[in-house]
Amino acid sequence: MFDVIAFLVQEYRDFSACPGPDDLARKLAAVGFEDDVIHDALDWLSSLLAQGAVPEVLAESRLPRILTQEEREGLPLEVQDFVLFLDRVAAVNNVQREQILDRLMDVPPDERSLDAARLTVLAVLWRHAAEVDALIAEELMVAIDGPMPLQ
């Protein structure tokens, strides 16, 4: 599923340029993705799009985020640290952070890796057309391009 997300982020730099679900599914099938992977990815993205407005209190809160017991037990420690780091350095806002956590918790537990977290963050930022710091963008792109070689 995350291969489809990576493809979409690379193919459509602007989320609003994505075709509708039916056309997108046909294009993804033509590129070579399997139907079940396409279906899973489009459902996952649809859930991201369907997330409504959050309470204003959450959107404006400056309090640190404490993960729920379910999140602490369900997400690998490196994923927890990564998401909270992005929150702490204001690379994502509160709404984006909550969407990232929601989308990660919707993934099967065996797929909740650091690369999955990077791609989830990319998808959420892509959906919001958010500006991303160059160093953060480089870290996120590791999930697509692999680590940059040392020079």
UniProtKB/Swiss-Prot annotation:
Q: Which domain of life is it from?
A: Bacteria
InterPro entries named among the record's database cross-references: Smg
What does the sequence similarity comment in the record state about its family?
Answer: Belongs to the Smg family.
Identify this protein by name: Protein Smg homolog
An example of a Pfam family matching this protein is: DUF494
Question: What gene is it encoded by?
Answer: smg
The beginning of the lineage is: Bacteria, Pseudomonadati, Pseudomonadota, Betaproteobacteria, Neisseriales
